[in-house]
């Protein structure tokens, strides 16, 4: 039986708390008192992440932005760009971090796919020692699930070279 209790905090307030965290980059426990308690905000964040709402929201925003920026433009891009970025992370709280020997960074690596207007289409985060081809393939798999029907060219640097990724 579904839970029909009335919410104590509005979803808008929870989203505002998540936007605050994103903008300021602070710890969950340091949320100001104007927002709900951090365990509740974190609960909704993880719940929406698990059911794919963040990805669906991003996809809808990209399509809407492309339509409103230039009405003659299609919802789906034709060209995308794939690249990796190594980022440092804290010593605690991250299980799958590694060392990127090339950039000498201990942390994680994010593979980002953006369109030519720099709008995020797909992302994959893995340990820093993960090969670009492995992370790129995971990011491309996420991109394929989004159904950008016109996308036919993804540009990438030499780190993504090789036959397995091209297929």
Positions of PLM-derived features:
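Short alpha-helical elements
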Residues: 1-167
